[in-house]
Amino acid sequence: MIQAIVFLPLLAALVAGLGQRAIGATASKILTTGALFTSCALSWPIFLSFVMGTGEAEVVTVLHWVSSGALQFNWELRVDTLTAVMLVVITTVSALVHLYSWGYMEEDPDQPRFFAYLSLFTFAMLMLVTANNLVQMFFGWEGVGLASYLLIGFWYKKPSANAAAIKAFVVNRVGDLGFMLGIFGTFLVFGTVSIPEILTAAPGMAGSSITFLGMRLDTMTILCLLLFIGAMGKSAQLGLHTWLPDAMEGPTPVSALIHAATMVTAGVFMVCRLSPMFETSEVALGVVTFVGAATCLFAATVGTTQWDIKRVIAYSTCSQLGYMFFAAGVGAYGAAMFHLFTHAFFKALLFLGAGSVIHAMHHEQ
């Protein structure tokens, strides 16, 4: 069941993308949208079983992936309460965005390519949230980055779209450098990349120190801060937020998908998933709280001065993500995830509403 949820969008993306000439635009659209609605229909029962309290956390092994010295891990799909919430958010919003794109992209000659990118994006995000080890999470993380680059620069004949896509890609690489260093450091300290093993061992590492750039620093603080830099890049927090407003150059359905449901929530998800690590470091939690609060105020203030309808919503998203990080920083992970869940739906609706307005005004923003 979980394999179907995760791999159906990938299958649809490959067929629609590579076979677009053979099967035509309409078949591509039907295939990708159908796959997404199937994934969505399969993920709701999982979510509801966790809501009712009957759901069991499980790990499904897909294949043995890497075995190199001490570095050994499988490709595994992990289903627990946190994953169940994200599955529902991602598949539902993505399915609705696919459906909306039928009308919105009607006159575009490159429809199969667009739908293939959307499905690929969804697959990468599902890969990220079902990850049971940090390397698989990084795979999903980079996949989302790549797909967002392709989608933001979808109208590649527009110079502004190209510039925005490259900007989003580069700013995210800055954050990803921190995330990579965090993963390397975690492997160095714990000797494993498996998330459950790391979270079990994390409290025991509290108070230990490590040499970093020639200074003795608290191990858990430095690891959590490096991981959080990754979250800042992906979730457009203060300092690495510059790509988010420019990412509005893509088609409106892309904005709804990237900025409401999926990509920007990856950072919040990661902080919540690794919360036992962050709990061991007061400093790291303080930084998360401060950055979240600062972003929340800053982005909302900037948003009030914008004239472009989509940019206003983009800054609003930035501000709401600040709230989520603030909640995570003060230890209210439930509140952070609840806000993530509710925000995804209303923000996607706002973007799609804005898209309808722009469409009706003949692309006047």
Task: Please tell me what each predicted stretch does.
Residues 6-21, 95-96, 232, 236, ...:
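N-terminal signal-anchor/start-transfer transmembrane helix
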Residues 1-7, 85-88, 138-140, 150:
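Mature extracytoplasmic enzyme cores
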Residues 96-140, 146-365:
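Hydrophobic transmembrane alpha-helices and their helix-loop junctions in integral membrane proteins
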Residues 4, 11, 15, 75, ...:
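Residue-level signal for short hydrophobic patches within transmembrane helices
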Residues 8, 13, 34-37, 264, ...:
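Hydrophobic alpha-helical membrane-embedded or membrane-associated segments
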Residues 1, 19-116, 188-215, 221, ...:
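Transmembrane helix-loop-helix hairpins at membrane boundaries of multipass inner-membrane proteins
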